[in-house]
Amino acid sequence: MRKIVIDMQNYLFADAVAAAFKSSDYDIEVIRAESQRDTVELCQIYEPFVLVMEVTGYAPWKLGERLRLRDEIKALCPNCKIALMVDSNTERQTAKDIRDAKKDGLIDQFFYGSMPAEYLMDQIYAM
């Protein structure tokens, strides 16, 4: 069974993603980080194939902090793909910066928070 770790401020959306995977035919287990401090430890323990992190305009979810966390995760789990999620309606500049991070090869994928959980699940599976 493949694993993903989700580190999101929006618990409702994280729960929706976890429920979507649980009720799907995909053989993927979702591990939710309760706090940002848990993320590194969970990645080290479970060695997920994808880490999904939400990015907002507020600490500790700012892009710079997420990219520092990405560096730490990649040092421990070099095969883990990094995906960032942002609300492109309220965080327009952050969304642009995340697109640039993808273009520059700093992350593997990005998602907008406005997409349905089922679509997000399909995109994660395809990674």
Model-derived segments and their meaning:
Residues 1-4:
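Extreme N-terminal starter segment of soluble prokaryotic enzymes
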Residues 7-8:
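Conserved acidic carboxylate
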Residues 11-32:
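Two-component/phosphorelay signaling modules centered on CheY-like receiver
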Residues 34-50, 60:
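Acidic, metal-coordinating helix/loop segments flanking the phosphotransfer/catalytic sites
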Residues 44-46, 72-79:
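Conserved phosphotransfer cores of two-component systems
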Residues 50-75, 86-89:
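Conserved phosphotransfer microenvironments
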Residues 51, 82, 109-110:
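Two-component signal transduction core modules
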Residues 86-126:
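Output/docking surface of receiver
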